[in-house]
């Protein structure tokens, strides 16, 4: 076998008959498979050992030669070579066909490749191939045309008329002769001539033909090879036949399909030998053709061949297609050894980098290592005994196991793996029981809970794999989420509740006003019962030697609470003391107002001082973010562990529970409900009198009940007791929110109706009182709709992620700096008056392209090519800067990827991105993972005048990325200028908007219903909206330029996600949008050898043009094309990646005709052939191999001087040759 890591690229082409024979080890002549008595393969059959190799290792069929010493000998009795039986997985056979047969992929695909080459319609081809019509191959001296079709009757008449002077045939033989007659060079030249004058339909057809003919010409494939004289038989172990209990056999469908081909082929041979009548022979040839069609792609033409129980047989094409096909089932997702799965359970005692593995599971996973260690320690005499010992689970194996798993990380994965944090590495700790124990803080990254979730565990085997798991994948390193750079391991639920309880303050608790010299004294007082956790006390500030207090504060006494003193013990020594939950306290230390002079009466101070809020979930998150920023990963993960332990301990001590008495009764509720009923009655009366329409009545009733519910909710909030456990849980952010509480103690309110609106009758009861049967029934619809929506959304979101990953998988950070001179001007994204994404968010972690100047003084705030961190970004925003030019993925010049400078900071680490980072995949996951949080619904404005139905949520994201025409499309202007008139045209039910530009004036007619977004006298730029709605990006790219389109798509995606409260870094969306715009459609080829209408990568287009200019020719012109992500995935340069995505047969058909070469640049194609992926540690630069040129700095667009130099050099060379 060839070493897969050695080859650079992979090419595919059409196989010639000679090629097929050269692969083959012999011809399969008989349809037999196995002798059912001896279970030995039959001679010349589909499993013949002489052709495909022995069924047992080192043993010939008759048993004359056994054992390895006869390796390579061919047995003189049975003719079988003595070798390994696994050659039966790689040796092919062939079938010599008695008549040529067309390959269905090339005849039936859309467009029909054969039809294009021959310039014939697929209909007429079908008639010829399946023996319905004759085709004239050589008209001789008759008035017939070449390629003219004749029916059986016409053929007989012509034969009578002209005799043997012309040549007409039917079937694949005829097609083969026609294909052999095609003169590629001549046809290509003629078509190129025609193109100069052709227009419309004719031109399109010519371009398509030229494309195919040119592909044949360039690739060296012969069109006649689309017709086969011989077909390959795949190795028998890839179409196995196994015996089931009860003596029956299960066999792969392919064997049935091959059998039919062989049977029909043998029958045809016999008929030809017997000189049978032509009609019988024709029928047999047609059946052979159909059998081969079924073998290659069953069901593509006519009814599929079925097996027992009317089940269509799986042909060769089906083996590749779809989720169960070879690509997705076996090449992109393999099952691996040394893995297990089990239910997960919480392990609160674990450290952040640990997980609990059940003893038995660990013993099985690490079995070989334990066996080796047992032998090494002389606890077992040999490997066999060691295995027995392990299977018996002797007592002394457990100690060995303990030693073996030290320093060996394992990987834990939870399906669905929506982003890269779905697989993380941990150090195993042996636990009792059968469940895997998971650290509670990593649950959020995995989206795991302990209600029966299962997780899979994998053991990295090689040293490199272990090192990577430990260095790159250890859970303790993954504190920030890749999608937005915010901490993902924030405490939740019990931990939040415990820390909230710990940091509460209460007036007048025991020991209030005591003053201590340091924290140890406080702890002693607490243990001895002198103070309570919530007591407010004083501590001498100078006892905190490392904390950053001001000199003034150090002389004083700090007023704090016992709980906060305990909480601050877990913080880093020199981190500011946390006394109030504000960002100011985190960054600048405790405010002066919490200090009293020594000797001042603390009780007077406490009398007036308000209680400080306890620390809630959001504040804990801010603390973690700040600690990460200052102290980096290691210290943060220690802090998280301490915070977890503290939180669990305190929530246990607090004894917080929920009882029915905690749900209070609201006294004002009956009055509010009564008042609402009266209002509803009034509205109904107005409707009956005809003062308002039914729609208005409905809207008002809904409004009345919503107001009543809000009123009750507000009253509940006002009457809250801060010590009520339910209110503590919801206030701290541990669980539940105000609307849950309203449903328990207030009223449930209005319910969704099946038609998508609201029911007018509200649910007045709450859960404390209990619902009536009627109310319960009304609630069910909304509840069920919620469940079904979630299920549908998950599938949609998963499919979106798959398409995103596919289109961006080859975007990798390839170099440090691409040297581009362009940048992206960013400012805050707004929608009307609403801020969608502030400028600050768009600057953090990006490089500046130009100097940033202070708008007031004009001085340089930030130099160009600087990485902006949080502080720099804040400074720029505070200075009042409105827009900044940054380095962006949009303007990066790196081929097949991006450079460090254009990408900026890696969100997941907070550092500059490293060369080799697979930023495309990360971007796709970051956009896809929150997909499940987006809504499914398309918002309708409910018939309010002047509003369009706009799509939002997941459907809108799909609409943007698939570049579809949006629902509720806006009309945009093609000229820049002033709006001179907006006239109504009642006859047409439209409005006419006139835009007067500098050179021309345009009038746009827009429907009455749509809202006009402009007024007379407004100045408007081309590409801006005249009406409400979404712009069609394909229109925008025509009217404006690529940059404007990219910006529009970026802000539209951000709108959808930010509306739902999901933050995603701009750069992720930029990576995706750039992939949609990486192609150019060539309009005029100039002097290049590109065909008009071809789609080319921008980089390849520039390269071809550079060559044309150097050789003194005219460059090609093209226009940028916006492709949806599905289309963009299928248009990628890698046929392997495209074939494994969708439309497998179409992609492979096209690739083989063009003789495509897959340069193996992306991740997917390398996974498919089993090569190490060229990202991360797999990049050539990191693997001590010759780096490919891809890793070097790519040339930006050639400058004129470069080109002149090259031309000079060329002239010089020519001069030299002249001299010679």
Curated annotation (Swiss-Prot):
Keywords in alphabetical order: DNA-directed RNA polymerase, Magnesium, Metal-binding, Nucleotidyltransferase, Transcription, Transferase, Zinc
Residues that, per the record, bind Mg(2+): 449, 451, 453
Catalysed transformations (reactions): RNA(n) + a ribonucleoside 5'-triphosphate = RNA(n+1) + diphosphate
Gene Ontology BP terms: DNA-templated transcription
Signal sequence residues: none
GO MF annotations, alphabetized: DNA binding; DNA-directed RNA polymerase activity; magnesium ion binding; zinc ion binding
Free-text cofactor note: Binds 1 Mg(2+) ion per subunit.
Cofactor: Mg(2+); Zn(2+)
SMART domains assigned: RPOLA_N
SUPFAM superfamilies from the UniProt entry: beta and beta-prime subunits of DNA dependent RNA-polymerase
Binding residues annotated for Zn(2+) 2, in chain numbering: 818, 892, 899, 902
One Pfam family of this chain: RNA_pol_Rpb1_1
Recorded GO CC terms: DNA-directed RNA polymerase complex
Coiled coil: none
EC number: 2.7.7.6
EC category name: transferase
Residues annotated to bind Zn(2+) 1: 60, 62, 75, 78
Annotated function: DNA-dependent RNA polymerase catalyzes the transcription of DNA into RNA using the four ribonucleoside triphosphates as substrates.
Oligomer and partners: The RNAP catalytic core consists of 2 alpha, 1 beta, 1 beta' and 1 omega subunit. When a sigma factor is associated with the core the holoenzyme is formed, which can initiate transcription.
Family named by the database record: Belongs to the RNA polymerase beta' chain family.
Protein name as catalogued: DNA-directed RNA polymerase subunit beta'
Provenance organism: Lacticaseibacillus paracasei (strain ATCC 334 / BCRC 17002 / CCUG 31169 / CIP 107868 / KCTC 3260 / NRRL B-441) (Lactobacillus paracasei)
């Amino acid at each position: 076998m060839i070493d897969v890591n050695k080859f650079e690229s992979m090419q595919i082409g059409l196989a010639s008959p000679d090629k097929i024979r050269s692969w083959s080890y012999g011809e399969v002549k008989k349809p037999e498979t196995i002798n059912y008595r001896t279970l030995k393969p039959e001679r010349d059959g589909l499993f013949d050992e002489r052709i495909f190799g022995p069924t047992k290792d080192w043993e010939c069929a008759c048993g004359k030669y056994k054992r390895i010493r006869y390796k390579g000998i061919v047995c003189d009795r049975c003719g079988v070579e003595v070798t390994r039986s696994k050659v039966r997985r790689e040796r092919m056979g062939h079938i010599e066909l008695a008549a040529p047969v067309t390959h269905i992929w090339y005849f039936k695909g859309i467009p029909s490749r054969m039809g294009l080459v021959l310039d014939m319609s697929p209909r007429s081809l079908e008639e010829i191939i399946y023996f319905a019509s004759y085709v004239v191959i050589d008209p001789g001296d008759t008035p017939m045309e070449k390629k003219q079709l004749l029916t059986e009757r016409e053929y007989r008449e012509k034969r009578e008329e002209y005799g043997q002077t012309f040549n007409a045939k039917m079937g694949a033989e005829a097609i083969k002769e026609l294909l052999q007659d095609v003169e590629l060079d001549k046809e290509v030249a003629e078509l190129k001539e025609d193109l100069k004058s052709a227009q419309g339909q004719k031109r399109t057809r010519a371009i398509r033909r030229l494309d195919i003919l040119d592909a044949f010409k360039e690739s060296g494939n012969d069109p006649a090879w689309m017709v086969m004289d011989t077909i390959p038989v795949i190795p028998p172990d890839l179409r196995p036949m196994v015996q089931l209990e009860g003596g029956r056999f299960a066999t792969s469908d392919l064997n049935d399909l091959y059998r039919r081909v062989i049977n029909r082929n043998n029958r045809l041979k016999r008929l030809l030998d017997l000189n049978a009548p032509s009609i019988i022979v024709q029928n047999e040839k047609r059946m052979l053709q159909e059998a081969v069609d079924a073998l290659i792609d069953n069901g593509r033409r006519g009814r599929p061949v079925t097996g027992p129980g009317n089940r269509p047989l799986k042909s060769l094409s089906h083996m590749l297609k779809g989720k169960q096909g070879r690509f997705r089932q076996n090449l992109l997702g393999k099952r691996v050894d040394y893995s297990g799965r089990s239910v997960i359970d919480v392990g609160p005692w674990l450290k952040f980098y640990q997980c609990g593995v059940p003893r038995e599971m660990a013993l099985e996973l690490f079995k070989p290592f334990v066996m080796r260690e047992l032998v090494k320690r002389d606890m077992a005499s040999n490997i066999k005994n060691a295995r027995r010992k392990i299977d018996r689970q002797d007592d002394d194996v457990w100690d060995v196991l303990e030693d073996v798993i030290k320093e060996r990380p394992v990987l834990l994965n939870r399906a669905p793996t929506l982003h890269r944090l779905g697989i993380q590495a941990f150090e195993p700790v042996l636990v009792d029981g059968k469940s895997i124990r998971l650290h509670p803080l990593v649950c959020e990254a995995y989206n795991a809970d302990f209600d029966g979730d299962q997780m899979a565990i994998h053991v990295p085997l090689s040293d490199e794999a272990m090192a990577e798991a430990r260095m790159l994948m250890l859970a303790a390193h993954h504190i920030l989420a890749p999608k937005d750079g915010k901490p993902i391991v924030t405490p939740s639920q019990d931990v939040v509740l415990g820390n909230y309880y710990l940091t509460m303050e209460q007036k007048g608790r025991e020991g209030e006003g005591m003053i201590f010299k340091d924290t140890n004294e406080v702890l002693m007082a607490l243990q001895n019962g002198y103070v309570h956790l919530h007591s407010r006390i004083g501590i001498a500030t100078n006892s905190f030697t490392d904390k950053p207090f001001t000199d003034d504060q150090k002389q004083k006494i700090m007023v704090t609470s016992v709980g906060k003193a305990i909480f601050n013990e877990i913080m880093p020594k020199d981190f500011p003391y946390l006394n109030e939950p504000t960002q100011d306290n985190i960054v600048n230390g405790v405010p002066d107002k919490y200090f009293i002079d020594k000797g001042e009466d603390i009780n007077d101070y406490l009398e007036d001082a308000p209680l400080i809020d306890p620390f809630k979930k959001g504040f804990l998150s801010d603390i973690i973010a700040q600690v990460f920023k200052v102290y980096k990963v290691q210290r943060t993960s220690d802090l998280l562990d301490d915070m977890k332990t503290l939180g669990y301990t305190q929530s246990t001590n607090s004894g917080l529970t929920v009882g029915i008495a905690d749900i209070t009764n609201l006294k004002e509720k009956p009055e509010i409900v009564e008042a609402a009923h009266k209002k509803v009655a009034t509205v109904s009366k107005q409707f009956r009198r005809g003062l308002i329409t039914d729609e208005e009545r409905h809207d008002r009733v809904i409004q009345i009940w919503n107001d009543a519910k809000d009123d009750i909710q507000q009253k509940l909030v006002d009457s809250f007791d801060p010590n009520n456990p339910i209110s503590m849980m919801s206030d701290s952010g541990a669980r539940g929110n105000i609307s849950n509480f309203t449903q328990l103690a207030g009223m449930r309110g209005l319910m969704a109706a099946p038609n998508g609106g609201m029911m007018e009758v509200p649910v007045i009861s709450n859960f404390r009182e209990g619902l009536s049967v009627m109310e319960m029934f009304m609630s069910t619809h909304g509840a069920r709709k919620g469940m079904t929506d979630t299920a549908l959304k998950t599938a949609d979101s998963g499919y979106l992620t798959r398409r995103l990953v596919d289109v961006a998988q080859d975007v990798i950070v390839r170099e440090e700096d691409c040297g581009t001179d362009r940048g992206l001007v960013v400012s805050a994204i707004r929608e009307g008056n609403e801020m969608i994404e502030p400028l600050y968010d768009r600057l953090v972690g990006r490089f500046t392209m130009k100097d940033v100047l202070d708008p007031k003084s004009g001085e340089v705030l930030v130099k160009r090519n600087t990485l902006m961190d949080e502080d720099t970004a804040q400074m720029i925003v505070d200075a009042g800067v409105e827009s900044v030019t940054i380095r962006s993925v949009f303007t990066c010049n790196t081929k097949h990827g991006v450079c460090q400078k254009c990408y900026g900071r890696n969100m997941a680490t907070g550092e500059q991105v490293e060369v080799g980072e697979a930023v495309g995949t990360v971007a796709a996951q970051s956009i896809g993972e929150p997909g499940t949080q987006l809504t499914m619904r398309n918002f309708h404005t409910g018939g309010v005048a002047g509003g369009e139905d706009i799509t939002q949520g997941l459907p809108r994201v799909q609409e943007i990325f698939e570049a579809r025409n949006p629902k509720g499309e806006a009309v945009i202007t093609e000229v820049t200028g002033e709006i001179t008139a907006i006239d109504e045209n009642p006859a047409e039910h439209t409005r006419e908007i006139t835009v007067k530009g500098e050179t021309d004036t345009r009038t746009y007619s827009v429907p009455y219903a749509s809202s006009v977004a402009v007024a007379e006298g407004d100045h408007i730029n081309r590409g801006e909206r005249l009406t409400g709605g979404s712009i069609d990006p394909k229109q925008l790219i025509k009217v404006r330029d690529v940059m404007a389109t990219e910006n529009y798509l970026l802000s539209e995606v951000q709108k959808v996600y930010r509306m739902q409260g999901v933050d995603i870094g701009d750069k992720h969306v930029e990576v995706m949008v750039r992939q949609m715009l990486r192609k150019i459609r060539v309009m005029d080829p100039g002097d290049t050898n590109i065909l008009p209408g071809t789609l080319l990568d921008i980089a390849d287009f520039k390269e071809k043009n550079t060559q044309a200019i150097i050789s003194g020719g005219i460059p090609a012109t093209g226009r940028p094309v916006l492709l949806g992500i599905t289309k963009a995935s299928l248009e990628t340069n890698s046929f392997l990646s495209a074939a494994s995505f969708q439309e497998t047969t179409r992609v492979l058909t096209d690739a083989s005709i063009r003789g495509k070469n897959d340069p193996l640049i992306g991740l997917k194609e390398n996974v498919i052939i089993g090569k190490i992926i060229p990202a991360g540690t797999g990049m050539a630069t990191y693997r001590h191999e010759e780096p490919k040129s891809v890793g070097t700095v790519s040339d930006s667009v050639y400058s004129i001087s470069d080109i002149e130099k090259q031309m000079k050099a060329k002239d010089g060379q020519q001069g030299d040759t002249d001299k010679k």
